[in-house]
């Protein structure tokens, strides 16, 4: 008995009922589960929102989202919902703002790559950044020199733990 094109009312959907190999969201109950043994090959999910995984997740590789930051009127915002790796070539002294951190209880880390232009630029960090020994690092000053910083929060952005990942890189 085939239910392709309509939902079954008196029998479960089986693989034989799926003619095109695609199950639409409307065909799946919100509390449905698929056994891992039933998944094989490459699975390409299409979704929006969070994906919660119970147990271990293994990946051969993964990609992080990259955003290029620009500043205006000596200010730049890192929107933490948009990426988790940011790059910024300084064109002026800048004050950073970190916006849209995940809620308290969700751990989140991000990386910021800063490139000096031909003029020695300065950064003012958010007061919520807790640096090692409570001292913000001194920036590299040479034209084209790169500094990389990593940050971590788990309290909704009340505190960001800041670390130098590398300095005077090129």
Predicted regions: what is each one?
Residues 47, 53, 82, 145-147:
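A generic structural signal for well-ordered coil/turn residues at beta-strand boundaries
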Residues 55-82:
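Predominantly extracellular/luminal regions of secreted and cell-surface proteins
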Residues 1-65:
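Fibrous stalk/shaft segments of extracellular and virion attachment machinery
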Residues 11, 21, 81, 103-107:
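Short, surface-exposed loop/turn motifs at beta-strand boundaries within globular domains
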Residues 49, 76-78, 99-104:
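Short secondary-structure boundary/capping segments within folded domains
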């Amino acid at each position: 008995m085939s239910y392709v094109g309509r939902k079954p009312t008196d029998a479960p959907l089986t693989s034989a009922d799926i003619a095109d190999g695609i199950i639409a969201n409307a065909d799946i109950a919100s509390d449905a589960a698929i056994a891992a043994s039933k998944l094989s090959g490459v699975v390409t999910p299409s979704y929006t929102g969070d994906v919660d995984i119970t147990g271990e997740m293994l990946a051969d590789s993964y990609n992080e989202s990259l955003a290029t930051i620009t500043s205006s009127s000596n200010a730049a915002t890192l929107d933490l919902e948009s990426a988790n790796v940011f790059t910024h070539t300084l064109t002026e002294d800048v004050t950073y703002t970190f916006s849209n951190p995940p809620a308290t209880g969700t751990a989140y880390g991000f990386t910021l790559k800063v490139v000096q232009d031909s003029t020695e630029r300065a950064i003012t960090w958010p007061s919520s950044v807790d640096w090692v020994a409570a001292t913000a690092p001194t920036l590299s000053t040479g034209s084209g020199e790169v500094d990389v910083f990593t940050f971590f929060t788990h309290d909704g952005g009340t505190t960001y733990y800041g670390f130098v990942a590398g300095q005077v890189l090129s």
